[in-house]
């Protein structure tokens, strides 16, 4: 309408000037030519205006279709969401557990981690007249993780952070149970290199049994997370990991967390995967150094080997590990055995030999339910100068039934029996029943 009005006005102006042109030229042909020229000019202007309008519409549509670099995509999918050129993924689960625990030789105060999951070396011994039963309800094993990845130099760089709420020094069960997050894993991956805090390269995490509780059969398993630098090439992995030896002092009891290493722990591992499952063979070398302000530094060499894996058995799988060496300490059995001990006669640090293993079977009963059963053990070859109150072995068995009541929602029931025995034959046991409800996301 606006363009038509413009045309009418221009034609009117041109017509009003026509008598003047006629008086000047007196020629009808000249007047017609002038009018035709004006009309042609108006058509050209209208065409230009139309083209410009279409161009503006196209640019506007493109601007709407293409978000800015800082716009967060609101399209949810399994591949995560994007912020700029970085893709983020959120993961984890909400876990509610009920534990009913009976300690044959004395219990633990509320808030102790021993009441949250099985720690083999902490089972009380030597007080058979003091059996204690406790019931605990907790959601502290709830877990949350964030993954961020982007293209850097034609390769994918990934950062990962994972937390839960176990072992929290904050909070209590009196009023609000305000447990603080703790760091589990935090690392960066790029071009075969992983740096940060991660599961030890000495450990095959696929061998961990499925359970209703946070962790089970800890006696003979390698179970360590720590800061490290790891390089993976093909089936081989090599790592330098944080070194920290636990030492039994000359007095013969207790534990010194020496943390006096001058070199990191060195780990090498070979992985093999196939249709059958996976197998791994790992070796570790470590320095057991003890140095204080009042004693000269002493050290010994620790080493270990570990074979572990997961193998398919029918519709289920068999998970296992076998580990042994000298000075393994905290790497096996959740540090039930120290890495070394100070000889009270010489003052030297001597590595303590230890060995253990576990095996568990996971077998599906239906599409939504499965049964797990397993056994684990750890043994120490303590030096003669250690007292007879030193831990000689720990053992445990468990069985668990898990059922998926809805997508990503699992309920589980578990029974566990754990025992610890000292060099003098004194022992104690833990019997625990666990009910859990878990929702993964």
Q: Across the structure, where does each feature detected by a protein language model lie?
A:
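Gram-negative bacterial Sec-dependent N-terminal signal peptides
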Residues: 2-22
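N-terminal periplasmic/intermembrane-space "pro-region" immediately following the signal or transit peptide
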Residues: 22-109
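Outer membrane beta-barrel
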Residues: 76-116, 120-247, 260-273, 278, ...
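Outer-membrane beta-barrel proteins
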Residues: 80, 129-134, 176, 217-219, ...
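Sequence/structural signature of outer-membrane beta-barrel proteins
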Residues: 101, 151, 166-171, 200-204, ...
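Membrane-spanning beta-strands of outer-membrane beta-barrel proteins
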Residues: 139, 181, 224, 262-265, ...
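Detector for outer-membrane/organellar transmembrane beta-barrel domains
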Residues: 274-391, 395
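Outer-membrane beta-barrel "beta-signal"
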Residues: 403-405, 428-441
């Amino acid at each position: 309408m606006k363009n038509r009005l413009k045309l009418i006005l221009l034609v009117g102006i041109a017509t009003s000037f026509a008598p003047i042109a006629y008086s000047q030229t007196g020629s009808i042909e000249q007047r017609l030519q002038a009018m035709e020229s004006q009309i042609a000019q108006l058509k050209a202007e209208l065409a230009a205006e139309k083209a410009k309008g279409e161009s503006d519409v196209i640019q506007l549509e493109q601007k709407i279709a293409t978000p800015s670099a800082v716009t967060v995509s609101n399209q949810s999918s399994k591949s995560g969401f994007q912020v700029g050129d970085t893709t983020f993924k959120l993961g984890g689960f909400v876990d509610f557990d009920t534990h009913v625990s009976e300690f044959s030789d004395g219990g633990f105060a509320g808030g102790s981690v021993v009441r949250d999951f099985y720690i083999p070396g902490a089972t009380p011994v030597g007080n058979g007249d003091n059996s204690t039963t406790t019931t605990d309800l907790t959601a502290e094993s709830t877990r949350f993780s964030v993954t961020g990845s982007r293209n850097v130099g034609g390769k994918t760089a990934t950062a990962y952070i994972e937390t839960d709420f176990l072992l929290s020094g904050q909070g209590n069960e009196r009023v609000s149970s305000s447990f603080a997050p703790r760091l589990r894993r935090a690392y960066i991956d790029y071009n075969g290199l992983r740096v940060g805090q991660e599961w030890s390269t000495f450990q095959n995490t696929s061998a961990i049994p499925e359970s209703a509780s946070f962790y089970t059969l800890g006696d003979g398993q390698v179970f360590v997370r720590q800061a490290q630098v790891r390089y993976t090439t093909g089936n081989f992995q090599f790592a330098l990991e944080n070194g920290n030896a636990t030492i039994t002092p000359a007095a013969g009891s207790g534990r010194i967390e020496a943390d006096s290493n001058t070199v990191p722990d060195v780990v090498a591992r070979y992985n093999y995967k196939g249709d059958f499952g996976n197998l791994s063979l790992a070796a570790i070398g470590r320095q057991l150094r003890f140095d204080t302000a009042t004693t000269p530094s002493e050290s010994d060499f620790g080493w270990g080997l570990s074979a572990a894996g997961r193998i398919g058995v029918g519709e289920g799988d068999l998970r296992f590990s076998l580990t042994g060496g000298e000075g393994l300490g905290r790497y096996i059995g959740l540090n039930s055995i120290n890495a070394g001990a100070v000889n009270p006669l010489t003052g030297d640090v001597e590595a303590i030999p230890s060995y253990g293993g576990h095996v568990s079977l996971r077998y599906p009963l239906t599409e939504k339910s499965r049964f797990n059963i397993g056994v684990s053990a750890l043994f120490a070859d303590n030096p003669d100068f250690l007292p007879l109150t030193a831990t000689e072995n720990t053992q445990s068995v468990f069985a668990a039934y898990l059922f998926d009541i809805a997508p990503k929602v699992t309920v589980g029931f578990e029974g566990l029996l754990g025992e610890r025995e000292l060099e003098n034959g004194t022992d104690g046991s833990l019997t625990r029943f666990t009910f859990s409800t878990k929702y993964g996301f």
